[in-house]
Amino acid sequence: MRVNITLEHKESGERLYLTQKNKRNTPDKLELKKYSKKLRKHVIFKEVK
C-alpha cells in the first residue's frame, strides 16, 4: 500500500518535496537528506502528513 507524503524542513518550514512510501515496509516517519533552495545546501527533510 503506497501513500503520497510531503517532506518538510523543520527549521525553514520549507515543504518542497513530494514522494511516495510503502507503509508496510517503512512504518516509521521518513527522513531524507535533500537540497534546500532557501538555504542553498543539503539538509534533512522529514515526513509530515
Curated annotation (Swiss-Prot):
Q: Which InterPro entries match?
A: Ribosomal_bL33, Ribosomal_bL33_CS, Ribosomal_bL33_sf, Ribosomal_zn-bd
Q: Name one GO biological process term.
A: translation
Alphabetically ordered keywords of this record = Ribonucleoprotein, Ribosomal protein
What Pfam families does the record tag this protein with? Ribosomal_L33
Task: Give GO terms: molecular function aspect only.
Answer: structural constituent of ribosome
Organism encoding this protein: Lactococcus lactis subsp. lactis (strain IL1403) (Streptococcus lactis)
Lineage summary: Bacteria, Bacillati, Bacillota, Bacilli, Lactobacillales
The cellular component terms of Gene Ontology attached to this UniProt record, alphabetical and capped at eight, are:
cytoplasm; ribonucleoprotein complex; ribosome
Per the record, the gene is rpmG3
Domain of life according to the entry: Bacteria
Protein's recorded name: Large ribosomal subunit protein bL33C
Protein family according to the UniProt entry: Belongs to the bacterial ribosomal protein bL33 family.
UniProt-listed PROSITE patterns? RIBOSOMAL_L33
